[in-house]
C-alpha cells in the first residue's frame, strides 16, 4: 500500500500543485479535478487545525471497561419489523442512559451514517456528501480490502453507495475508518453486542468517532451527557425519520 493510500489527506497540497501542472483533457474534467482537490484541502485543514474535534478521548475513557467484539464488515441485513425495532430502540436508549451518553439526532433520509460521521469528524452533519465521496473513493482504490464482504458485483455496489440517500453499512464504516484514520465506536441495540470498535487497517487511529446504531435502521452522533447543551456544539432537529420515535 503506497503512502497516498495510507493517508489520503497528507498530500492534499501536493495534489493541488500537480493538478495545476497537468493539462486536463476537457474543461469539465479539469473543473471536477479542481473541485476534488478543494474538497481534500478543506477536509485536511479541518482535521489538522481543530483539536477539539477529537474531544481528547473522553468518551473512550468513559467506556474503556466495555469489551468490544471483533468487527467483520458486512452489508445491511434485513430490516426488523416495527415490534422488534421498538424493543431494540428501548434497549439502546437504556444503554445510552447507563453510559451517560446523549444522541444528536440525524435526519432519516438514507444518509444518516454519513451525517453522523460528518458530525463527529467535522462538527457539521451537512458535510455528509463529502464523507460519502471519500468513502466511495476508498472502496474503489482499495478494492481488495472490502470486496470479499460484498455479496454482489463490486462495481454495482460502489455505484450504489455513490448515490445520495443510499444507506451505509458496516463495509462503508470500515472504509471510513481506513480513509479518515479513525476508530469508529458503535453503541448498538444488538442484544448480544452492545459495543463495537472499528479500527483502520494496519495503522493507529488518529481520531475517534462515536455513533449509536439502532436496529439496522439508523445512526446518530454520540456525545457525553451535557455536552450538547454547550454553546459550541451544533444542535439540529431532524426533518425526517424512518421510524416514529
Curated annotation (Swiss-Prot):
UniProt xrefs under SUPFAM superfamilies: Cysteine proteinases
Gene3D superfamilies reported for this sequence: 3.90.70.80
Chain intervals with Low complexity compositional bias: 10-35
Highest taxon in the source lineage: Eukaryota
Matches recorded under CDD domains: OTU_plant_OTU9-like (cd22751)
InterPro entries assigned to the protein according to its UniProt record, in alphabetical order: OTU_dom, Papain-like_cys_pep_sf, Peptidase_C85-like
GO MF term set: cysteine-type deubiquitinase activity
UniProt region (Disordered), positions on chain: 1-37
Recorded catalytic activity of this chain's protein: Thiol-dependent hydrolysis of ester, thioester, amide, peptide and isopeptide bonds formed by the C-terminal Gly of ubiquitin (a 76-residue protein attached to proteins as an intracellular targeting signal)
OTU domain segment(s): 101-225
Key words of the record: Hydrolase, Ubl conjugation pathway
Positions annotated as active site in the UniProt record: 109, 112, 218
EC number(s) per entry: 3.4.19.12
Biological function: Hydrolase that can remove conjugated ubiquitin from proteins in vitro and may therefore play an important regulatory role at the level of protein turnover by preventing degradation. Inactive cysteine protease.
Family: Belongs to the peptidase C85 family.
Protein's recorded name: OVARIAN TUMOR DOMAIN-containing deubiquitinating enzyme 11
Source species of the chain: Arabidopsis thaliana (Mouse-ear cress)
Gene name of this polypeptide: OTU11
